[in-house]
């Protein structure tokens, strides 16, 4: 499974400011903490949001706000209120996963129904098509309310942990199953400025005992999302005239030691970890 989406698109403007979120379950709260700090340092306005898994939830939520700082403030409140019981349950059994995501469907439906307007920022969300084996990318704002929820859930359906989701006559699982860091560059003589928010630096050494199938699936997801193919490392940076840049913001691995991507009861702690431990790396795109 891979939990990062960086999709670079052509633009008719001189510079495209894009905000991209990776995935990571409850670590989506870390991303909001990171973004809050980044915006305090440089208050940007973005033209495009992208996200996979938990990043899809963050991107979709923020797309409703013309003022991203107001969106961040409300996202903080949301993560402070979210508990495990609002995301998943063990019963009823699905037969294809250890957890049932019906509570997440209810939570997302309630969240979107409370929005005073439609999305205001173009937002792309990725999910893995279990029929074609491909990563499908959808425009969030083009979906009706029901399908907005299903699209978010499709991107968050970690195989084995959450059940796959029927959406658009297809069957979907977590977007990170195929692409943790998908970098597709289509350049049209415009400067690409990517702000990439992720909780991940490298894999966190973890010798915590594995006592259940849920623990095993969670550990496997963490290992794969941090180690399976790293397109960022292969970015072409040896050029005199770059076509853009990617600014990656993350937290050191050790600050997340002891935290679990399926534990949504620690939203306040995770937001603070993101806010107080931001690390920045800049990559040139050729």
Residue ranges and their predicted role:
Residues 1-7:
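Sec-dependent signal peptide recognition
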Residues 7-52, 60-286:
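Patatin-like phospholipase
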């Amino acid at each position: 499974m891979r939990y990062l989406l960086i999709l670079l698109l052509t633009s008719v403007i001189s510079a495209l400011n894009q905000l991209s979120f990776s995935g990571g379950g409850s670590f989506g709260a870390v991303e909001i903490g990171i973004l809050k700090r980044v915006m305090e340092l440089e208050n940007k306005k973005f033209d495009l949001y992208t996200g996979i898994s938990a990043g899809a939830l963050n991107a979709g939520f923020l797309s409703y706000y013309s003022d991203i700082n107001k969106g961040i403030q409300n996202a903080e409140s949301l993560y402070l209120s979210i508990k495990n019981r609002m995301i998943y349950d063990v019963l009823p059994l699905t037969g294809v996963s250890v957890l049932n995501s019906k509570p997440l469907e209810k939570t997302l439906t309630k969240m979107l129904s409370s929005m005073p307007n439609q999305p205001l920022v173009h937002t792309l969300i990725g999910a893995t098509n279990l029929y074609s084996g491909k990563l499908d990318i959808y425009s969030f704002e083009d979906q009706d309310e029901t399908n907005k929820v299903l699209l978010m859930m499709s991107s968050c359906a970690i195989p084995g942990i959450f059940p796959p989701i029927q959406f658009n006559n297809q069957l979907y699982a977590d977007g990170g199953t195929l692409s943790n860091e998908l970098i597709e560059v289509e350049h049209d003589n415009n400067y690409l400025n990517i702000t990439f928010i992720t909780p991940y630096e490298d894999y966190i050494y973890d010798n915590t005992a594995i006592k259940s199938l849920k623990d095993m699936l969670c550990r496997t997801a963490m290992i794969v999302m941090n180690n399976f193919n790293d397109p960022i490392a292969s970015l072409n940076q040896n050029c005199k005239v770059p076509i853009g840049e990617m600014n990656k913001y993350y937290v050191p691995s050790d600050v997340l030691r002891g935290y679990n991507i399926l534990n949504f009861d620690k939203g306040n702690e995770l937001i603070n970890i993101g806010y107080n431990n931001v690390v920045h790396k800049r990559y040139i795109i050729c």
